[in-house]
Amino acid sequence: MSTENHKAYAIKQKDIDYNEKDLLMVQAQLINCNSKGHVLVEKVSKDAGTYSAGKYYIPGVAMKFGEHPEEAGLRVLTEELEIDDREIALVGTQSHWNDVKNHWYLLYLFETVQPISQEEIDNPCEGIDELLYLNLEDATEENSTQGLRDICEAMKIPGKTYI
């Protein structure tokens, strides 16, 4: 007989409640690097009213129930960044555990085959103050989301699972 600690369960939420305990989040993230190895990030608008307001965030979306990871990756471009659709390639997966909220994050990491143009970077959509390439070593608790810092740490040790 399994104890509660050994049981797995899933909750399908129409609207994600990020305050829910024991939450499993499956996300698609866009990891585009420039020639210096800096990663494309968005700076979320200061008035966004979310935990990420005013901070750097790696563009990403929560996957819809039953959605293919590549479709979610394309939504990062068209819905999150509101830029032209283009071919993407899966470059990795990551798993992160958040002790504070008891959340488990499973991430599909994509990059665009065709680079995002400077014109697209210079014209961020509503809700994003700025798109830029950031040296992830410059990410701090004050200027970036925990998710960005988790991804940065995982990129240092490819293949390591963080749960």
Question: What is the predicted function of each stretch?
Answer:
Residues S2-Q29:
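Acidic, metal-coordinating catalytic segment for phosphate/diphosphate chemistry
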Residues H38-V39:
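Hydrophobic "anchor" residues
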Residues A48-G54:
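A conserved beta-turn-beta hairpin within the catalytic core of GNAT-like acetyltransferases
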